[in-house]
């Protein structure tokens, strides 16, 4: 009896790219739900606009490159890029901003390099940085959370604000940003940094309504908890490995604690660093991008530490309130060097001189 030996590979991984991307999309739901509860419908609408822009941009480039449309569009990578960008920008940013950022992310940062798996930089963060540099005022115009809003926009008001720059009653973004205390609101990180530079003490800032009874700003801490829960889901389902999120969070916590102990009157507290801004979103959904992150276990640890350090430095001494996007892109640049020096030893080969 003759036996036929099948060719390799001899194992089959049932997890396709589209399935992994779908699980990541599902994992973002707790964080998005917290955003919706505290900040309204804005970010959900931004995600929908970004998704349409991403699919159209990807389809257009694939058509120009004469690549198969259906197979590529079904891998869900464009939708994930759109979602990450949609939840990262202010909820009432004009529709054309998220469209510009998404189109730039898909065409320039992804397809220009050959598509999924070829891009050296995280596409969503490239799109975000383009928007931050080009439209700094709009990209720092966040609504106060529920409970601190002087005017709470409805779903119809949110749509009108995004597409027409005013609510149905004629309120502008500047009016919506003013909280119940009559003070224009910002993210906890931005609010804290601005207050410190204005001469207020950390104790005075922490006593303000934004931080009343919470560890990192009303609303924002629960948004981060939501993305943390989603990250645990990704770890449990083995969609990501633990090295990058753990080393990133540990690094950020270490440097934030060290800086705060040395200069408590001029630097943000460690808990605000950990549970404000895009910390947990970055730790589990952005920094863990398998295409642009390090590929070795030691390299992943170094990569996470580097992002944590850069995030703390930019947040503490830079001109932007949340430096995560810049930190991730700078770490992306270092990935080839990190991988080169952290490759495991190959036995049976003499080490080159």
From Swiss-Prot:
It is a multi-pass membrane protein. It is found in: Cell inner membrane. GO terms for cellular component: plasma membrane. The chain crosses the membrane at residues 20-40, 44-64, 77-108, 123-143, 214-234, 242-262, 267-287, 301-318. Its cofactor is FMN. Keywords: Cell inner membrane, Cell membrane, Electron transport, Flavoprotein, FMN, Membrane, Phosphoprotein, Translocase, Transmembrane, Transmembrane helix, Transport. One of its GO terms (biological process) is transmembrane transport. Its EC number is 7.-.-.-. The modification FMN phosphoryl threonine is found at residue 187. It holds the Pfam family NQR2_RnfD_RnfE. InterPro entries: NqrB/RnfD, RnfD_bac. Coiled coil: none annotated. It is an enzyme of class 7 (translocase). It comes from the Bacteria. Belongs to the NqrB/RnfD family. The complex is composed of six subunits: RnfA, RnfB, RnfC, RnfD, RnfE and RnfG. Part of a membrane-bound complex that couples electron transfer with translocation of ions across the membrane. This is Ion-translocating oxidoreductase complex subunit D. The gene is rnfD.
């Amino acid at each position: 009896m003759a036996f036929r030996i099948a060719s390799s590979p001899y194992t089959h991984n049932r997890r396709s790219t589209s399935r992994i991307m779908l699980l990541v999309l599902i994992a973002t739901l707790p964080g998005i739900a917290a955003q919706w509860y505290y900040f309204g419908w804005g970010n959900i609408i931004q995600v929908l606009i970004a998704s349409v822009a991403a699919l159209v941009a990807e389809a257009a480039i694939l058509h120009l490159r004469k690549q198969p449309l259906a197979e590529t569009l079904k891998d869900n990578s464009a939708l994930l890029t759109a979602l990450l960008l949609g939840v990262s920008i202010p909820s009432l940013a004009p529709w054309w901003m998220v469209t510009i950022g998404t189109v730039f992310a898909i065409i320039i940062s992804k397809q220009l390099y050959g598509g999924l798996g070829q891009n050296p930089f995280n596409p969503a963060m490239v799109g975000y940085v383009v928007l931050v540099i080009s439209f700094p005022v709009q990209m720092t115009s966040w609504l106060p959370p529920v409970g601190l809003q002087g005017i709470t926009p409805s779903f119809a008001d949110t749509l009108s604000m995004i597409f027409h720059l005013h609510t149905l009653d004629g309120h502008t973004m500047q009016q919506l940003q003013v909280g119940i205390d009559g003070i224009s609101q910002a993210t906890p990180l931005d609010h804290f940094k601005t207050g410190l530079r204005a001469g207020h003490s950390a104790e005075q800032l922490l006593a303000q309504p934004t931080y009343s009874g919470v560890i990192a700003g009303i609303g924002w801490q629960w948004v981060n908890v939501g993305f943390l829960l989603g990250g645990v889901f990704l770890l449990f389902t083995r969609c990501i490995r633990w090295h990058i999120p753990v080393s990133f969070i540990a690094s950020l916590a270490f440097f934030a604690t060290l800086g705060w102990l040395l200069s408590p009157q001029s630097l943000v507290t460690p808990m605000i660093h950990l549970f404000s801004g895009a910390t947990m979103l970055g730790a589990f959904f952005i920094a863990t991008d398998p295409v642009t992150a390090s590929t070795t276990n030691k390299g992943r640890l170094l990569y996470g530490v580097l992002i944590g350090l850069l995030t703390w430095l930019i947040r503490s001494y830079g001109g932007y309130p949340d430096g995560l996007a810049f930190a991730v892109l700078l770490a992306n640049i270092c990935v080839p060097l990190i991988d080169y020096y952290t490759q495991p030893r190959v036995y049976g080969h003499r080490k080159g001189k």
